[in-house]
């Protein structure tokens, strides 16, 4: 809907229209070829007759104001001799009395003058003009018989910047035949001729943009040379136009005049001297829209299209700053409300303010001119907490506790892995000990680790005060501290009627999908809890959308509707089947919002300079160790993935390919491990995912009499800490054979300095957590991390997928890890079209999977032998390395593929 025009705008438009008509009339006259002086004189009488009709005043006695004349009669010939003009070249009655006498003397005139169209010129007149060509008398007679032209308007001419002349007017030219008779003053007139129009002329125009002007024209080699000769030249490769400073305007126009093949229309608001005229420019009616975005804790940026009105508004702000790199303006937060209020007064500008969530989070910056530093958080009084715990806190850990207390015990503690989130969470919970009982929800593999941590750091607690729920029949409120796993929490919903005021959620990224059972069970608890402490080393495992549940758990009033969050931070797109929230946008603003109101995150590089950096290396294992039969199985599995199948069948084919990769890499992995032992490596970790690979590694270490431990999904939680201590205190060659998914959290192996990944995993967060089993507090050596990659396997597609996901985390400030920058030999990508197709399937399967744990369960329970029927031949392919029944050790389970991506219909439970 267009905006209504104001009275001033209508007046300006009407003035500009009149000026345009005048310029158009002058242009039409200029385009007509000039004839000789006598020819112009011959046509002049007819023109003068018409002009005399137009300039005669209406008869006073006629109410309609129309004049009447006889058809075909010459008005000058019918006038009395006394009234005919002689000395003056033109005639017009000057008074009402003279006009009345004139009309009375012409009483026989009967035809009315219908319109001011030009009269026709007879052939006799044209012949007469030719016969008198070049004679002064003919010109004088013509000039003497010409009546006075239209009365001129000196004010209009002054506005137009053109001098007033006594010759023919613009309207005179427009309504005549486009010819102009020069003033002779009794002397012979020279013939005026114009050069013929250029046959092939390149036409263009100049357009004003602020203090510069640009030229819109096609390509011309000579013109380009002229452009390059001007010092203020600037070429825009995107629009393919040249622009210059106004100081070069005159030089450009003079140079273009010398080019015979170029015609350039000048600027309308600039005269021949290069300066501006007094013509007022019409107001800009272009409607522009924009929005505000946060770029720091103190400043915000405006993303909006170009408009002179907007620029004028920006220049009214005292804190304005223009960034030439981004070509955007930014201001202090304290001027946000002022800018928005003034923008609403402009009808052609729509500027969206910062979301209400941001204005609430940064309320102090919006009201104050001074910015409060994050380091100004007051130190909390921890005198009521056990002295042993307080004395063991590092300075940055004590700052984390103070930050949490300043947020009233509601935060997402997202410190990097290995920085002691557990001890900080226990200290925060102990500060609110009067509000206990305490509920601690953790992954099942670290339940007993948390029990030992409470007994270690809080001597005031007795073992009877801690209740670890082991089965679904256990009591959730039996102790002062109650520890339960995510899976058991969903089975104890009936016992959740008694609210907990203090809740700790370890690895809170497990709650990334509201559709899962564990999330539905945890959300009601967090809703009624007074203190909520979320712990996560990787708060956004894959996509910013996965942060939403954690944000509303800490701040229920932030983004009550997920759609608003998705539009701003997930690059939400509407597709035929619904909204897609899998993207990411405004990650910098999201990071600032989280750090200000929800999240505290410190990286190892920020707080522990003595902690050695990780040194990653991608090792391409010898493909010759892969047997021919294994290669054939891989090729067959890859071929099955490229066929047109349903989504369920594609995921099953993907799992087959994933399992075949583990089987094919067994000889290569074992060879690499034996080489490490022979080279003098004493203690290191080996991570794998498939049971067939873990079994093969453990069997080979037993055959070589190498001391080792093994922790996988079948290892009881109570035994894992003992195995970890056994490895830490061991001497000599010791290898820890670990499952990527079962031993990637809650365990410390800081006595080792090398981690070997025999397999890759699609989720980079899981890989980073596994790395940090060694890269933890207490580590004094440089940590080496080796990723074993085999060409022609699933590694071809998993490695670039990991790099892409870790890049998104880095942009959001949620990971300091960059596989591309910190890993040696990263140029390992798919090459042929078939590989690209398979990579797309990997990417779609793992990104569309709303819950990695559901897909992980399907991968763990997938029985390769029941699908391929080749378990009996596997031992022959692998020689002495594998057991005959290695592929059939896992009990068959029901395959499950559950995906939860229906974010568009989700509304915050708060």
UniProtKB/Swiss-Prot annotation:
Enumerate the residue ranges of region (Mediates interaction with RPA2): 2-30, 5-30
Indicate the segments forming the Helicase C-terminal domain, all copies: 672-825
Give the EC number(s) listed in the UniProt record: 3.6.4.-
Q: Which SMART domains match?
A: DEXDc, HELICc
**Reaction(s) catalysed by this chain's protein:** ATP + H2O = ADP + phosphate + H(+)
The HARP domain sits at 198-268, 284-355
Belongs to which family? Answer: Belongs to the SNF2/RAD54 helicase family. SMARCAL1 subfamily.
Q: What is this protein called?
A: SWI/SNF-related matrix-associated actin-dependent regulator of chromatin subfamily A-like protein 1
């Amino acid at each position: 809907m267009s905006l209504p025009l104001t009275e001033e705008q209508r007046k300006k438009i009407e003035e500009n229209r009149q000026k345009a008509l005048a310029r158009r009339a002058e242009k039409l006259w200029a385009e007509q070829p000039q004839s000789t002086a006598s020819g112009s004189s011959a046509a002049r009488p007819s023109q003068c007759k018409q002009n005399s009709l137009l300039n005669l005043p209406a008869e006073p006695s006629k109410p309609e104001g129309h004049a009447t004349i006889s058809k075909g009669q010459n008005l000058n010939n019918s006038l009395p001799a006394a009234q005919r003009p002689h000395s003056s070249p033109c005639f017009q009655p000057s008074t009402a009395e003279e006009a009345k006498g004139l009309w009375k003397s012409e009483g026989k005139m009967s035809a009315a003058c219908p319109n001011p169209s030009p009269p026709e010129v007879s052939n006799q007149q044209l012949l007469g003009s030719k016969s008198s060509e070049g004679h002064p008398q003919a010109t004088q007679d013509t000039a003497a018989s010409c009546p006075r032209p239209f009365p001129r308007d000196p004010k209009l001419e002054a506005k137009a910047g053109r001098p007033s002349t006594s010759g023919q007017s613009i309207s005179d030219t427009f309504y005549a035949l486009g010819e102009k008779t020069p003033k002779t003053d009794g002397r012979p007139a020279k013939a005026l001729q114009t050069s013929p129009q250029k046959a092939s002329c390149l036409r263009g125009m100049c357009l004003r943009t602020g203090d510069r002007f640009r030229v819109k024209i096609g390509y011309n080699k000579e013109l380009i040379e002229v452009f390059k000769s001007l010092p203020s030249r600037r070429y825009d490769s995107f629009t393919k136009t040249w622009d210059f400073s106004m100081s070069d305007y005159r030089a450009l126009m003079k140079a273009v005049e010398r080019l015979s093949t170029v015609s350039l229309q000048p600027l309308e608001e600039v005269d021949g001297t290069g300066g501006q005229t007094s013509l007022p420019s019409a107001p800009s009616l272009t409607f522009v829209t924009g929005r505000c975005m946060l770029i720091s804790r103190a400043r915000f940026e405006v993303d909006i299209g170009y408009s002179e009105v907007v620029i004028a508004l920006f220049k009214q702000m005292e804190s304005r700053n223009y960034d030439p790199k981004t070509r955007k303006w930014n201001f202090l937060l304290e001027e946000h409300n002022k800018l928005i209020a003034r923008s609403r007064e402009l009808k052609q500008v729509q500027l969206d303010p910062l979301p209400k969530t941001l204005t609430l989070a940064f309320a102090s910056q919006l009201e104050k001119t001074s910015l409060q530093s994050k380091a100004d958080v007051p130190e909390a009084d921890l005198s009521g907490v056990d002295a042993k715990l307080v004395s063991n806190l590092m300075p940055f850990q004590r700052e984390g506790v103070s930050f949490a207390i300043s947020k009233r015990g509601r935060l997402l503690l997202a410190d990097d892995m290995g920085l002691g989130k557990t001890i900080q969470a226990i200290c925060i919970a102990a500060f609110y000990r009067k509000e206990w009982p305490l509920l601690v929800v953790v992954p099942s593999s670290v339940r007993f680790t948390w029990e030992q941590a409470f007994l270690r750091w809080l001597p005031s607690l007795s073992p009877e005060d801690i209740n670890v729920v082991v089965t679904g029949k256990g009591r959730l409120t039996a102790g002062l501290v109650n520890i339960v796993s995510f899976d058991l929490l969903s089975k104890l919903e009936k016992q959740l009627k008694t609210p907990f005021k203090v809740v700790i959620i370890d690895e809170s990224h497990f709650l990334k999908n509201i559709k899962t059972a564990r999330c539905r069970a945890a959300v009601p608890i967090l809703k009624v809890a007074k203190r909520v402490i979320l712990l996560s080393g990787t708060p956004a495992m894959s996509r910013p959308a996965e942060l939403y549940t954690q944000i509303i758990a800490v701040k229920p009033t932030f983004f009550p509707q997920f759609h608003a969050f998705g539009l701003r931070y997930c690059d939400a797109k509407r597709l035929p089947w619904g909204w897609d929230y899998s993207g990411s946008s405004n990650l910098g603003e999201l990071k600032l919002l989280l750090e200000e109101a929800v999240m505290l995150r410190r990286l190892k590089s920020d707080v522990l300079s003595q902690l050695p950096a990780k040194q990653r290396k991608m090792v391409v294992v010898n493909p010759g160790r892969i047997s021919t039969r294994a290669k054939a199985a891989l090729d067959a599995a890859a071929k099955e993935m490229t066929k047109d199948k349903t989504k369920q069948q594609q995921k099953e084919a993907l799992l087959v390919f994933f399992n075949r990769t583990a089987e094919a890499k067994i000889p290569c992995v074992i060879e690499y491990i034996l080489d490490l032992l022979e080279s003098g490596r004493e203690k290191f970790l080996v991570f794998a995912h498939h049971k067939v690979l873990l079994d093969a590694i453990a069997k080979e270490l037993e055959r070589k009499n190498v001391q080792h431990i093994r922790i996988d999904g079948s290892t009881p939680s109570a035994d894992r800490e003992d195995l970890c201590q056994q490895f830490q205190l061991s001497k000599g060659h010791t290898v820890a054979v670990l499952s990527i998914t079962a031993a990637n959290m809650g365990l410390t192996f800081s006595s080792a300095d090398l981690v070997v990944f025999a397999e890759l995993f699609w989720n980079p967060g899981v890989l980073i957590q596994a790395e940090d089993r060694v890269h933890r507090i207490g580590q004094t050596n440089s940590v080496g991390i080796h990723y074993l990659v085999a060409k022609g396997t699933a590694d071809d597609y998993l490695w670039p997928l990991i790099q892409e996901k870790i890049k998104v985390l880095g942009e959001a400030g949620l990971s300091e890890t960059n596989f591309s920058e910190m890993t040696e030999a990263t140029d390992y990508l798919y090459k042929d079209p078939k590989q690209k197709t398979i990579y797309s399937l990997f990417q779609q399967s793992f990104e569309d999977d709303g819950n990695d744990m559901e897909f992980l369960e399907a991968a763990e329970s997938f029985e390769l032998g029941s699908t391929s029927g080749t378990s009996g031949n596997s031992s022959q392919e692998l020689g002495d390395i594998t057991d005959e029944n290695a592929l059939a050790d896992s009990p068959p389970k029901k395959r499950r593929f559950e995906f939860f991506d229906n974010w568009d219909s989700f509304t915050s439970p708060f």
